[in-house]
Amino acid sequence: MFKSGFVAILGRPNVGKSTFLNHVMGQKIAVMSDKAQTTRNKIMGIYTTETEQIVFIDTPGIHKPKTALGDFMVESAYSTLREVETVLFMVPADEKRGKGDDMIIERLKAARIPVILVINKIDKVHPDQLLEQIDDFRSQMDFKEIVPISALQGNNVETLVQLLKDNLEEGFQYFPEDQITDHPERFLVSEMVREKVLHLTQQEVPHSVAVVVDSMKRDEVTDKVHIRVTIMVERDSQKGIIIGKQGAMLKKIGKLARRDIELMLGDKVYLETWVKVKKNWRDKKLDLADFGYNQKEY
């Protein structure tokens, strides 16, 4: 008997949702950064064994939006509640419950689907603090289970995956066993470039960046995959930061991104990077759609 199901990973920004998904999948399919609001699109991670398939949906961190991009991200996250049988509500062990958590809890109560509370980053707290956190959240909602984990170190992750397997119902294999995500390679390439920008820049710059893959094709002569990407920013000053002194920052972004892209594609890559200014793109629906943030996602 084959069993399958869809599982949403929900929570505030920067609680470790993408780290968890990448750990379960055994490879990077979601961007990771210590900066909030790193994930902007819903990303599917397809975990398949001989007898089960769990389709995880990693969602953007739920926050109070300040831009049209923020609205897109939050609606994209909440829309997954209509698509799944189970929700993993992830919270950090090293932060007390806040207004953002309470807002999510109210939406989860209204959705009326089983919710597993996942308390992440347990490696950062004393067991007594963890027990307090468990008691506090338990008083807010009737969770199906409460599972403390460390997504970074892998503690208890297998236990959580096994719990999900045990609760699966008989169903179809929705995706082939060798498919690990629903996003095309172009999307993953753009995310890998954006991840390097997130790691290497500060303040407002990371949030003002979109990455568009202009072309991606194999060069018959060199047998390399030739990829051209454009990094979009909102201001000239941000363009200067990303290019860096004598182009040093842009070279660094390209070099680090190329390594990850080559690992993913299993091919040699020639990566060409450009930077363009598109003023206030985060508040323009046409620009959002052009850069891959499309309302069709929800």
Curated annotation (Swiss-Prot):
One of its GO terms (cellular component) is plasma membrane. InterPro entries: G_ERA_dom, GTP-bd, GTPase_Era-like, KH_dom-like_a/b, KH_dom_type_2, KH_sf_prok-type, P-loop_NTPase, Small_GTP-bd. GO terms for biological process: ribosomal small subunit assembly. Residues 120-123 are annotated as: G4. Keywords: Cell membrane, Cytoplasm, GTP-binding, Membrane, Nucleotide-binding, Ribosome biogenesis, RNA-binding, rRNA-binding. Its main location: cytoplasm. Residues 37-41 are annotated as: G2. It is a peripheral membrane protein. Residues 149-151 are annotated as: G5. Residues 3-170 form the Era-type G domain. It is found in: Cytoplasm; Cell membrane. Disulfide bonds: none annotated. The keyword RNA-binding applies. Residues 58-61 are annotated as: G3. An essential GTPase that binds both GDP and GTP, with rapid nucleotide exchange. Plays a role in 16S rRNA processing and 30S ribosomal subunit biogenesis and possibly also in cell cycle regulation and energy metabolism. Monomer. This is GTPase Era.
